[in-house]
Design a protein with these regions (language model features):
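Small-side-chain structural scaffolding
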Residues: 44-45, 70, 77, 151
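Short, surface-exposed beta-edge/turn micro-motifs
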Residues: 37-40, 64-68, 74, 126-128
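Short N-terminal edge-element motif at the start of the domain
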Residues: 13-63
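Conserved NAD+-utilizing ADP-ribose enzyme module
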Residues: 2-31, 35, 81-206
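Extended catalytic/binding region for NAD+/ADP-ribose chemistry, centered on the ART fold
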Residues: 62-86
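Short, flexible beta-strand-to-coil junctions
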Residues: 43-49, 72, 133-137
Length: 206
């Protein structure tokens, strides 16, 4: 893994302290669940000015009814990237899967995320906004675990700025890899039998 600097997350007061950052990370990414569902869900954006979220049809799924989309804490690391950055991830949900992940990918982490090397400089410079919502306003989406939808206009409870994307992965103990092309690692993830997710792959280098 690359040597990473300490993550910085800030709100409208400016850069916050390490203790405040740790509390934000604990609150946001180890969110408690009620009856198997999270208390809070999240949306990540490069736009920090969104006051309310209006249902829309996602370009990647034009047959889906208009909805506001959010994710739980387990899915969050998939979105600690610049929006257009192709990225892939594989992870373990239990002890058996962890043993397989460790064997196949030579890691001690429970999740691996990977992106193309050409995105490393942008990862260092970029910042994104984390919008937090009350999960009771959403319903689980049947298409994927950890994703939630609402047909209503939703106002976020809070928004934070994440200005160290590399540091967020490090703080969450996510192994972050960079490779010139994702194809071979994608094939290994597909063949692993483990949970995986690919995002913005249509923009990946061929």
């Amino acid at each position: 893994m690359l040597p990473l600097r300490s993550p910085h997350v800030r709100d409208n007061r400016g850069v916050i302290t390490d203790a405040e950052r740790a509390e934000l990370f604990r609150r946001a990414h180890a969110a408690p669940k009620v009856h198997g569902r999270p208390d809070v869900v999240f949306h990540y954006s490069e736009d920090g000015t969104i006051k309310r979220f209006t249902p829309h049809v996602p370009p990647s799924n034009p047959s889906h009814p208009p909805a506001v989309w959010a994710i739980d804490a387990e899915r969050a690391p998939l979105y600690w990237f610049p929006r257009r950055c192709p990225r892939i991830s594989v992870w373990a949900n239990d002890g058996d899967q962890q043993a397989r992940l460790s064997e196949l990918f030579q890691t001690e982490a429970s999740r691996i995320c990977a992106a193309e090397t050409i995105w490393l400089d942008e990862m260092r410079r970029a910042h994104i906004y984390q919008y937090r919502f009350d999960a009771s306003q959403f319903a689980p989406w049947a298409g994927a675990d950890g994703e939630y939808i609402s047909g209503d206009v939703i106002q976020p409870d809070h928004v934070d700025v994440i200005d160290d994307l590399l540091g967020m992965h490090a703080a969450a103990e996510v192994e972050l890899r960079f490779t010139p092309r994702l194809g071979r690692l994608m094939d290994e993830m597909l063949a692993s039998g483990l949970p995986f997710s690919f995002v913005r792959i249509r923009d990946a280098r061929r």
